[in-house]
């Protein structure tokens, strides 16, 4: 649902949203595929060739990264299905969407788009006033969708380097949330060297564009292993370029991070 909002898709009238990720189905197992540079165009074409299976449900689909997509349609099926990134036992997808998944797998020798994270939109809770005046800049529908659901501004910028000058310009009018999803993506690809290179590149871009910025907060939103490709349940760091009441090494619950960083005058 969040991703559908970030991609400006129709979620009215209780439409259901489905995340679709490339995956191989074999030996009763779902194996997610993150290395789709050479196959994502043929996978996308195959999905669209069979898309008429969903006719009658007013389907809308948007692809965004290496064969991944968000699908919304008028359907009551909200199945509980396995989620990436780790392999999982195969679970049959119900209804016409299951027909689409099967047809694509048959034509692509086991490769298909498998749905997960299905749901409908609900009204969101109020956010801290200090967090309303923010423009989110990212290539991730997830990050953008969170901002959209909270009433914040958001811009989809696919190229990493392009996000930085856009962020500089937007800082003239609002605060900016600048998001780099590439670090997580390369971890799922199990490519440690590529992950290090992009971190070093981000560091150079920050120095180039924000060396004179006085108030920057760096967040690591979660851990992902570039060896196994799995998410890691670990304590994640954040760091500020300005003084706060937070002591070095102090654990701060997620719901208290913004108040503690911004201070009472910002709430």
Task: Please annotate each region the language model reported.
Residues 1-267:
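Feature captures the catalytic ectodomains and active-site-proximal regions of enzymes
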């Amino acid at each position: 649902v969040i991703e559908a909002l970030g991609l400006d898709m129709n979620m009215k009238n209780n439409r259901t949203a489905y995340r679709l990720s490339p995956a191989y189905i074999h030996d009763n197992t779902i194996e997610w595929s993150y290395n789709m540079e050479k196959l994502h165009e043929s996978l996308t074409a195959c999905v669209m060739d069979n898309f008429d299976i969903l006719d009658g449900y007013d389907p809308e689909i948007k692809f965004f990264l290496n064969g991944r997509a968000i699908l919304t349609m008028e359907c009551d099926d909200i199945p509980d299905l396995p989620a990436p990134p780790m392999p999982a036992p195969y679970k049959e997808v119900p209804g016409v969407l299951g027909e689409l998944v099967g047809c694509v797998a048959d034509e692509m020798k086991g490769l298909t788009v498998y749905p997960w994270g299905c749901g409908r939109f609900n009204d969101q809770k109020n956010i801290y006033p200090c967090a309303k005046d923010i423009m989110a800049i990212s290539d991730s529908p997830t990050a953008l969708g969170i901002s959209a659901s909270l009433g914040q501004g958001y811009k989809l910028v696919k190229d990493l380097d392009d996000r930085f000058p856009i962020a500089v310009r937007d800082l003239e009018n609002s605060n900016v949330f600048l998001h780099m999803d590439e670090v997580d993506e390369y971890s799922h690809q199990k490519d440690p060297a590529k992950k290090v290179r992009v971190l070093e590149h981000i560091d150079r871009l920050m120095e180039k564009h924000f060396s004179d910025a006085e108030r920057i907060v760096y967040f690591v939103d979660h851990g992902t292993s570039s060896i196994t490709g799995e998410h890691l349940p670990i304590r994640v760091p954040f760091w500020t370029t300005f003084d706060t009441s937070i002591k070095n090494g102090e654990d701060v619950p997620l719901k208290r991070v913004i108040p503690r960083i911004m201070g009472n005058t910002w709430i």
